[in-house]
């Protein structure tokens, strides 16, 4: 197993890409701290992992709640919280340190797209801009900063930020989202440069369109789905498993010489 006994925090693990990464990390032997703003989503992810490990590794099923928004399972912990709240972000990291004494891997996946309505910069409501930045940029900063403090003490660590192809090639009329993911790309490079001497690797994954609950409203419209497929040379929509495979590689020792890299997983969308 490629992540055996590695301690990993995955934010936004209650659905979509985060759920796919959490599931794959568990199968690769990682011990997990999963976080999400939605407890119901975390419980669904827990059930999926419990079932998978029971089938593949003989782990007992079942996840029991405790106090303070933390849920416990034989293979890891769950923290209900919002990455845009500093105390919550720090509590996510502390859950790993408290239980296992270290944190090897952070996947900064929690994020939002903003309004479903196409908006240019001058028509974007200020509160929408601020909320997108608060989650997509400040949330990544808060979790990474808290994790790095522990990684500096232990002398190693790896961070995988989930950015977007939109951080490299902007989507039309999505100014807030594009800017937020561009910031994640730049922040990833800055962290990689600053902390390489401390043996902390930092990379980002830039997904194209991936089929999740967040994108379903668009992909459920047949004309839009086909338009996206036609714009993708590989000829299909991305899946959470595609991103999970990339995350496993970047988090594993196989990527020991990889830092400051933006791994685009988009079926060729940005080259067309």
Segments predicted by a language model, with ranges:
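Substrate-binding pocket helix/loop in short-chain dehydrogenase/reductase
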Residues: 75, 117-121, 125-130, 228
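Residue(s) in the substrate-gating loop at a strand-loop-helix junction
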Residues: 164
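Active-site helix of classical SDR
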Residues: 144, 180, 188
